[in-house]
Amino acid sequence: VLIALGRWLQHSGYRVGVISRGYRSQALDEARQVAPNDDSASVGDEPLLIRRELEVPVVVGRDRLQALHTLIQDNAIDIVLSDDGLQHYQLPRDLEIVVLDGQRGLGNGRLLPAGPLREPRERLEEVDWVLERNSDDPHSGFEYHISGARHLASGRLVVWSDCLGQWGDQTLTAMTALGQPEQFFQMLTTQGLTVKTVSLPDHDVIMPQHLTGIVTETVLITEKDAIKLSGSIDSRLWVVEIEVQLPASLLTGLHDKLPTRVQT
């Protein structure tokens, strides 16, 4: 969602910057700007993916306020997007967007550790927008769409309709280290693909030993998995290109709330 929002802001003429904690990265104690050639162990997989996809300044660090100061001090920025920063109350903000899974909702509605919530559900009444994946609500619902697949070793990109024609009668392997892997697997099966699924712990790296014993000719992974790979690449790996279509009501609302960008 953040990448889709960042792209829309860029197309609207805004200079975008991003701050993030950089989960499981080595760059936590002091704010650090992410370089395109960094590795995920140093800065975190999600910040590195954001940096490469949007080609905008990204700063990681445990102290979000320090990360913000580093970002705006070193770069010309119109809008700062904070990745997963709702509870960082020292961080000033103009707009708040919460993203939920429409199927999971708020779980049992209880706060950690008894439930999944970081704050009471009433907090949602204070934010500017609540977006829900897998929701039929035209104002808040959004979906992920598969646009194609990229052969990781060669970089060859194939549109999704051609992928379905090529793989429709095959059994594939889908492997990922996402926190909610079932969403990725479901996206593939609803497209009519037959997949054997392999789930790794969230943020883990797909290693050669994970691929040992897999007999299928094609292994599908996500961009978040691919960003962590280096060295020799298994020729069976294909990266599924997934895009987010943001609800029109959000984009219209942002257009009305954001200041007009004056081109210089």
Residue ranges and their predicted role:
Residues 14-15, 75-78, 169, 216-217:
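Short, high-confidence coil segments that cap the C-terminus of an alpha-helix
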Residues 201-205, 236-263:
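Short, flexible loop segments at boundaries between secondary-structure elements
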Residues 218-224:
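Acidic beta-strand-to-loop metal/phosphate-binding motif
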